[in-house]
Amino acid sequence: NGAYTSFLGPQPLYLLVVVFLTSLGTWGLPQMVGKFYAIKSESSIQKGTIISTLFAIVVAGGCYFLGGFGRLFATPEQVAANGFDSIIPSMLSGLPDILIAIVLVLVLSASMSTLSSLVLTSSSTLTLDFIAPLKKKNMTEKSKLSVMRIFIAFFIAVSAVIAIVQAKSKVTFIAQLMGISWGALAGAFLAPFLYGLYWKKASKASVVASFVFGVGIMIVQLMISLGFITVSGGFLGLIFKNSLYSGVFAMLGSLVIVPVVSLLSKKTVPVNTDAMFSCYDRTVEVHATTALSDKKN
């Protein structure tokens, strides 16, 4: 069926969906914004671009070859019985103990760094942008810190519960779980982040619409994955085929919804938008070592 002879495999559309979800979806993850706050100068951007590109090549190339050579470690019968997620453990079982330990440490470090950035971003957003404005009295820094710690513990507990429930449910495909989480986050945040940075006409109503659309699509997908709702055939059948398809649809749909709703709700555009964008018009003098180009005449 072309699985071993075609460069794109027997399902090129599915491959395209995975590429969209893992590349375009990264733009819309809220925790990624925090990483840009740590940029020291424009010269750091230049170095980071080279390092991240090389890292992306290693990761993408490694994943591609893992998929290509995975068939050597698992037969179709084993995959049918244990699922695709059993291929990587089968490959690791043949490695020496020291290499298995290194792989486990790398996986745990990546998982913990993602979890920490997510819970920190979520707890600070809820505390500073939602709870603090609702308080009649100004919250002290100590009380804000206490509330953030409570949210951090709560989100970690929720993550543990989800992991336990997932281990005992029929939704065991890791990529589909990633599709639900990334689809909800990127579907909600991607368009507001992108248009908010470069387009003055982005409105508050469009941001709300993007949030409702992205999260709503993935909630429906979650209900379908858990078996509470059934969808088959036609356009809806394609969108909700699995969480990867619906995640990409949520992201691409939000890119259309935000400009359309913004043009229909011009009254909800913040009044100080011009003042916000004026920072791009001001002249800034910096040392040559911090400029984008470090070339000396």
Protein language model features and the residues they cover:
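Membrane-embedded helix-loop-helix hairpins and adjacent transmembrane boundary segments
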Residues: 1-297
